[in-house]
Design a protein with these regions (language model features):
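Structural signature of the two symmetry-related core transmembrane helices
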Residues: 58-72, 152, 261-276
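Juxtamembrane intracellular "pre-TM" segments in multi-pass secondary transporters
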Residues: 165-202
Length: 390
């Protein structure tokens, strides 16, 4: 359900803001960017709070309730300030759920079937379903209200899903009894690990380089290339299906490579992808470019998850994920989004070239991390991975 909602939120929220609320590209960029910057504060705070709960479902309850109330209120709002305030909360809540869901998948598939790659691939398939359903409903209804309705229903269903899930207690650990401030400092203390710090900014910049695509990609396809919602949905789905295929069918194969190698591959894919999209390629070229999502996102993502799990283990992985998303991924993504709106308004598709530069910086950092891969001791290896990898 979470990823089906993501399939609506990422490609269609900018269209909702433009078509229903009349926001310009710059205003859309401001709304999404400020929400992203706010995650830099909310991420570590949420991580410290969640790390002190005795039930791993606690963040699910909190975030899904916020989402349902937020989307319900969004229907009656009209002013820029009011919509901005609600989108801020919704963005923090939805992205706050992501590390909780991701680490739960990684943890629960460790000792049970399906494998993580298959489970994450199925989750990405739900993204495709969400994108397809909303795209078809938009065209069928001739409006953009299905975007709001779909997100409200998904958010409400996630509350029910959180209640239905069996309680998963956290094994006794000292952090639960620690004061909130101590847990917060312990989480931030992860940054003392230089490899972890280099990783979060390498992967963060590579993934943040998708900011123009997520903010203005649908607008470019609709307004500059005259595509329908169905065609836009198809392009998004091709990218996501490439992600699904990589995770489900190449996930185990990719385990022969070090996590750092996957991140480098993701950086290369991102540089090629954004450079080509800047040229307004025809549909037959857009299709293979969308397949590069398997590198720019999936390889970077999988490498990042394995890197975090390797150095921090099960108990600390959710906190490490939130620190990564809060202090590196969110601010860099927010900055990319902030410049994407004005770039789209002034340049259109050539604005992708700014994302090429962002991805290139991330690639350089990833190469530096790869070069350091044998210089620092690790706390362990993720099951299913072997030593001596490339």
């Amino acid at each position: 359900m979470f990823f089906a909602g993501f399939g609506c939120l990422i490609p269609f929220l900018p269209l909702w803001l433009e078509k229903v609320h009349g926001f310009s590209g710059a205003e859309i960029g401001v709304v999404l960017a400020i929400a992203g910057f706010s995650r830099a504060v909310a991420g570590p705070l949420t991580a410290a709070w969640a790390h002190g709960r005795s039930d791993r479902r606690a963040p699910l309850f909190m975030f899904t309730l916020l989402l349902t109330v937020g989307f319900g209120v969004l229907y009656v709002l009209d002013s820029f300030a009011a919509v901005f305030a609600v989108i801020l909360v919704l963005d923090i809540a939805y992205w706050g759920l992501l590390p909780v869901v991701e680490t739960a998948l990684l943890r629960l598939t460790r000792t049970a079937k399906p494998t993580y790659g298959v489970a994450r691939g199925l989750a990405s398939a739900a993204f495709v379903i969400g994108t397809t359903v909303v795209g078809v409903l938009n065209d069928w209804s001739g409006s953009f209200w299905p975007i709001w309705g779909f997100m409200l229903v998904i958010s409400a269903l996630m509350i029910g899903g959180s209640v239905w899930m069996p309680r998963e207690p956290v094994l006794a650990r000292a952090e639960i009894a620690q004061p909130f401030g101590d847990r917060l400092l312990a989480g931030l203390g992860m940054l003392r690990n230089s490899n972890f710090t280099l990783f979060i900014f390498a992967a963060g910049l590579i993934q943040a380089s998708a900011g123009f695509l997520y903010t203005s990609g649908s607008l470019v396809w609709a307004n500059q290339q005259g595509m329908s919602s169905k065609e836009i949905s198809m392009l998004w789905n091709i990218g996501t299906l490439a992600e699904v295929g990589f995770l489900m069918f190449l996930g185990n194969w990719s385990a022969r490579f070090r996590p750092e190698t996957l991140i480098v591959a993701g950086g290369i894919g991102a540089v090629v992808r954004w450079t080509a999209l800047a040229a307004l390629p025809p549909l037959w070229v857009l299709i293979p470019l969308q397949l590069l999502h398997s590198l720019s996102f999936a390889a970077t993502f999988l490498g990042g998850m394995r890197f975090i799990q390797t150095i921090h283990g099960d108990d600390r992985a959710p906190t490490a994920q939130m620190i990564y998303m809060g202090l590196a991924n969110a601010p860099t993504y927010a900055a990319a989004v902030l410049i994407s709106g004005p770039l789209y308004d002034r340049l259109g598709a050539p604005g992708y070239l700014a994302m090429t530069a962002v991805a290139a910086v991330g690639l350089v950092l990833a190469v530096l991390l790869w070069l350091k891969r044998d210089t620092s001791p690790r706390t362990g290896e993720v099951p299913g991975q072997s030593n001596g990898r490339s």
